[in-house]
Amino acid sequence: MNTRLEKFYKDNVVPALMKEFGYTNPMEVPKLVKVTLNMGVGEAATNKKILENAVADMAKISGQKPVVTKSRVSVASFKIRDGWPIGCKTTLRRAKMYEFLDRLINISLPRVRDFRGVSGRSFDGRGNFNMGVKEQIIFPEIDFDAVDAIRGMDIAITTTAKTDAEAKALLAAFKFPFRN
């Protein structure tokens, strides 16, 4: 079962990128590998209910149960110990990844207050894109009235692109709203 964005990739993005970068084989064209969502919840060290709410929010947003991340070292100034739960993360692949990106591009990002586009400089040099979201309430799955606290999250989009230019062209072909 192909999602709308996956079908768009095969029908429109692959031919456009083959022409733009001069690829001879469709398998050379960069593609999306995974989308990783990470939510750090520092307050979870003192109140376990906060982490449960964060896990529930991320499960609604991603459509799958996130993994609780634990601290690796004790930090006295943050009042956390080694092994304490301090966040959650999930990795989306295949159909869920395409569905999440479709919702992110077409529904969630336009709902951000004063949104002018995402920065085009957030690539890591190896063709992967990272961005942060300040509020989880931009996603339509989250009920605004049921939210206990506004939490942000990190979104990492991993591609097979070798360079940042290829990755940016790939995401721009998906109608990703870049500012520059």
Swiss-Prot record:
<keyword id="KW-0689">Ribosomal protein</keyword>
<dbReference type="InterPro" id="IPR020929">
    <property type="entry name" value="Ribosomal_uL5_CS"/>
</dbReference>
<dbReference type="GO" id="GO:0005840">
    <property type="term" value="C:ribosome"/>
</dbReference>
<dbReference type="InterPro" id="IPR020930">
    <property type="entry name" value="Ribosomal_uL5_bac-type"/>
</dbReference>
<dbReference type="GO" id="GO:0003735">
    <property type="term" value="F:structural constituent of ribosome"/>
</dbReference>
<dbReference type="GO" id="GO:1990904">
    <property type="term" value="C:ribonucleoprotein complex"/>
</dbReference>
<dbReference type="GO" id="GO:0019843">
    <property type="term" value="F:rRNA binding"/>
</dbReference>
<comment type="function">
    <text>This is one of the proteins that bind and probably mediate the attachment of the 5S RNA into the large ribosomal subunit, where it forms part of the central protuberance. In the 70S ribosome it contacts protein S13 of the 30S subunit (bridge B1b), connecting the 2 subunits; this bridge is implicated in subunit movement. Contacts the P site tRNA; the 5S rRNA and some of its associated proteins might help stabilize positioning of ribosome-bound tRNAs.</text>
</comment>
<dbReference type="InterPro" id="IPR031310">
    <property type="entry name" value="Ribosomal_uL5_N"/>
</dbReference>
<keyword id="KW-0694">RNA-binding</keyword>
<dbReference type="GO" id="GO:0006412">
    <property type="term" value="P:translation"/>
</dbReference>
<dbReference type="InterPro" id="IPR022803">
    <property type="entry name" value="Ribosomal_uL5_dom_sf"/>
</dbReference>
<comment type="subunit">
    <text>Part of the 50S ribosomal subunit; part of the 5S rRNA/L5/L18/L25 subcomplex. Contacts the 5S rRNA and the P site tRNA. Forms a bridge to the 30S subunit in the 70S ribosome.</text>
</comment>
<dbReference type="InterPro" id="IPR031309">
    <property type="entry name" value="Ribosomal_uL5_C"/>
</dbReference>
<keyword id="KW-0820">tRNA-binding</keyword>
<keyword id="KW-0699">rRNA-binding</keyword>
<keyword id="KW-0687">Ribonucleoprotein</keyword>
<dbReference type="GO" id="GO:0000049">
    <property type="term" value="F:tRNA binding"/>
</dbReference>
<dbReference type="Pfam" id="PF00281">
    <property type="entry name" value="Ribosomal_L5"/>
</dbReference>
<dbReference type="Pfam" id="PF00673">
    <property type="entry name" value="Ribosomal_L5_C"/>
</dbReference>
<comment type="similarity">
    <text>Belongs to the universal ribosomal protein uL5 family.</text>
</comment>
<dbReference type="InterPro" id="IPR002132">
    <property type="entry name" value="Ribosomal_uL5"/>
</dbReference>
<protein>
    <recommendedName>
        <fullName>Large ribosomal subunit protein uL5</fullName>
    </recommendedName>
</protein>
